[in-house]
Amino acid sequence: MRDLKTYLSVAPVLSTLWFVALAGLLIEINRFFPDALTFPFF
Protein backbone atom coordinates (compact mmCIF):
# COMPACT_ATOMS: atom_id res chain seq x y z
CA MET A 1 0.00 0.00 0.00
CA ARG A 2 2.89 2.33 0.71
CA ASP A 3 4.26 1.75 -2.79
CA LEU A 4 0.89 2.74 -4.27
CA LYS A 5 0.86 5.98 -2.31
CA THR A 6 4.42 6.68 -3.47
CA TYR A 7 3.42 6.10 -7.10
CA LEU A 8 0.34 8.31 -6.82
CA SER A 9 2.41 11.09 -5.31
CA VAL A 10 5.23 10.86 -7.89
CA ALA A 11 3.20 10.58 -11.12
CA PRO A 12 1.54 14.03 -10.92
CA VAL A 13 4.90 15.62 -10.19
CA LEU A 14 6.58 13.95 -13.15
CA SER A 15 3.70 14.76 -15.50
CA THR A 16 3.70 18.39 -14.34
CA LEU A 17 7.45 18.67 -14.97
CA TRP A 18 7.01 17.05 -18.40
CA PHE A 19 4.23 19.45 -19.43
CA VAL A 20 6.20 22.46 -18.20
CA ALA A 21 9.24 21.35 -20.20
CA LEU A 22 7.10 20.70 -23.29
CA ALA A 23 5.41 24.09 -23.01
CA GLY A 24 8.79 25.80 -22.62
CA LEU A 25 10.11 24.00 -25.68
CA LEU A 26 7.10 25.04 -27.77
CA ILE A 27 7.44 28.63 -26.58
CA GLU A 28 11.12 28.72 -27.54
CA ILE A 29 10.40 27.20 -30.97
CA ASN A 30 7.73 29.84 -31.54
CA ARG A 31 10.15 32.54 -30.41
CA PHE A 32 12.79 31.57 -32.98
CA PHE A 33 10.35 30.53 -35.74
CA PRO A 34 7.25 32.70 -35.31
CA ASP A 35 4.05 31.65 -37.09
CA ALA A 36 5.71 28.57 -38.54
CA LEU A 37 2.84 26.47 -39.81
CA THR A 38 5.27 24.85 -42.26
CA PHE A 39 8.99 24.49 -41.69
CA PRO A 40 10.75 25.56 -44.92
CA PHE A 41 14.20 24.35 -43.81
CA PHE A 42 13.25 20.67 -44.20
From Swiss-Prot:
Keyword Membrane: yes
Tagged with keyword Phosphoprotein: no
GO biological process: photosynthesis
Gene name in the database record: psaJ
Function: May help in the organization of the PsaE and PsaF subunits.
Keywords: Chloroplast, Membrane, Photosynthesis, Photosystem I, Plastid, Thylakoid, Transmembrane, Transmembrane helix
Cited Pfam families: PSI_PsaJ (PF01701)
Assigned protein family: Belongs to the PsaJ family.
UniProt subcellular location: Plastid, Chloroplast thylakoid membrane
One GO term describing the cellular component: chloroplast thylakoid membrane
Membrane topology: Single-pass membrane protein
Transmembrane residue ranges: 7-27
UniProt protein name: Photosystem I reaction center subunit IX
Source organism of the structure: Atropa belladonna (Belladonna)
Highest taxon, organism lineage: Eukaryota
